[in-house]
Amino acid sequence: RELAYAGFAVLHDEALMPAYRANIPVVIKNTNNPHHPGTLITTSRKVKHAPVVGIASDQGFASIYISKYLMNRELGFGRRLLEVLEKLALSYEHMPSGIDDITIVLREDQLTTEIENRLMAQLQEVLAPDELRITHHLSMIMIVGEGMRQRIGVTAESTMALAKEKINLEMINQGSSEVSIMFGIKKEQEEKAIKALYRTFFHD
């Protein structure tokens, strides 16, 4: 579900809901290799030594970086940000944040030139940020695995693998559940990044 929720066309997350509620395992098969046993999705599983069980990526994202000193102390900052998106009928995919900054990740196909100009102007007016910039043509890579909870250094291994290939990270986000890590990179580096991560976690 983490891979689907991240916006990648692996499996629609709502398709799992009936099976999840009834505690029914689901098997995903490969149409190009129907005799392969496939992937079993269950409500619980035994965590083996491998910390990562899946890697997926998708293109067509843009990120908007907003920075403002003492942003975390400003009441209603997040609400005003979301109101700007709502007024322009824009949905966001991810919103990683720090103490003084926040990044909005959107699907690029929502952003015509007119919409983008209006969005940036309204964010500037409503939020009065110290810095506001948009980055286009991003790919998002998601790695998932319940074993990441017990394994120290998965993030370090991932970033080291990307660094060896001279792949710059535009953004990184890890949820508090510790079962997934998302990386944002330039789309032209997507294939190289996927191969580097596969070599790191599935080298055998």
Where would I find each of the regions flagged by the language model?
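C-terminal catalytic "cap/lid" subdomain
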Residues: 1-176, 180-204
